[in-house]
Structures are given as structure tokens and as C-alpha cells.
């Protein structure tokens, strides 16, 4: 039986495949000091609140492009675990806002440290220049996604 002719793969097809694989890996055990897991959505939400300060459900909906019911569930879980609290709008608006707590900041720092240590283990044989180049490409990739999506992410 004849085999179909091989055509060179588009580079973006490789990117798609590799990002699909990346999404399935967990670099660290992702457990906080108290032994509970900080899931990805909690980490991302805490990161945004830490970077921008208190935000309402409406602001979070706009920032994440998610519906309010999803964010209500996520923020309710963070409230129950004491990682965020609800406060009146500091500038006098009607909507109450979510603010990261000290426990939330610590959980986020612990997660960041665990993730960084995991990446250090993965990239142990990479040169510092390769790690820096990879970080630059990831930032460029993410900022281009944000540009197309219209939702830039605050960076340090």
C-alpha cells in the first residue's frame, strides 16, 4: 500500500503539540506548607490580586474573560480557606472587592518557590543563556496572546 507523501510540519503545529504536552505536566507536587494543594486557578487568581490590589467580581470577570459564576466559585473557595477577604471598595464604589490576605500572599510565595525549584530541576542542564532566551520567548508568546485577547497581564 502506498504511503502518503510526507510534508514538512508547520512550526506552529509543533508549538501546538508541545503546548498541549506542557499543559499536562505538573512540575512540582504543588502542596503548601500546611499540606493542602494550591490549585492552578487559585494561584493565578492570587497572583492577579497581588499585582493589582483589590478587585470586584466585575473587574475579575473582565481581567480573566470568565463568567461571574465561575469567579464566584473560585473566590468563595479562596474566602473559605482564608486566602482572600472581602472589603468595601476603597474608593467608595458599591461593589465589594476581594483582597489577598497575608495567608494568601504566603501561599502564593510558597507556590512560586516550589514552581521555581521544579523548573530549576527540569532545566538543570540548560545554560543560563538558554533559560533567559526561553523566558524571553515565553513572555513574547504570552504578550502576543494577551494582545489578541485584549487582556494584558500585569508584570513585575
Identify the meaning behind each predicted range.
Residues 76-136:
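Charged, amphipathic alpha-helical coiled-coil/dimerization segments
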Residues 24, 47-51, 112, 139:
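Short, locally clustered residues in the helix-turn-helix/winged-helix DNA-binding domain
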Residues 1-40, 156:
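N-terminal leader segment of winged-helix/HTH proteins
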Residues 19, 42, 64, 75, ...:
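Short amphipathic alpha-helical/adjacent loop interface patches that line ligand
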Residues 27-70, 75, 81-83, 97, ...:
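N-terminal helix-turn-helix DNA-binding core of bacterial DNA-binding proteins
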Amino acid at each position: 500500500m502506498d504511503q502518503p507523501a510526507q510534508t514538512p510540519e508547520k512550526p506552529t503545529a509543533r508549538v501546538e503539540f508541545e503546548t498541549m504536552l506542557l499543559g499536562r505536566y505538573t512540575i512540582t507536587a504543588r502542596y503548601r506548607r500546611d499540606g493542602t494543594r494550591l490549585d492552578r486557578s487559585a494561584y493565578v487568581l492570587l497572583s492577579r490580586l497581588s499585582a493589582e490590589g483589590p478587585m470586584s467580581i466585575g473587574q475579575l470577570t473582565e481581567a480573566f474573560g470568565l463568567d461571574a459564576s465561575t469567579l464566584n466559585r473560585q473566590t468563595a473557595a479562596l474566602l473559605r480557606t482564608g486566602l482572600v477577604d472581602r472589603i468595601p471598595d476603597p474608593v467608595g464604589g458599591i461593589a465589594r472587592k476581594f483582597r489577598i490576605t497575608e495567608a494568601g500572599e504566603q501561599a502564593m510565595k510558597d507556590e512560586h518557590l516550589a514552581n521555581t525549584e521544579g523548573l530549576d530541576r527540569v532545566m538543570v542542564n540548560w545554560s543560563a543563556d538558554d533559560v533567559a532566551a526561553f523566558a524571553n520567548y515565553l513572555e513574547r508568546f504570552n504578550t502576543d496572546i494577551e494582545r489578541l485577547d485584549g487582556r494584558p497581564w500585569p508584570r513585575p
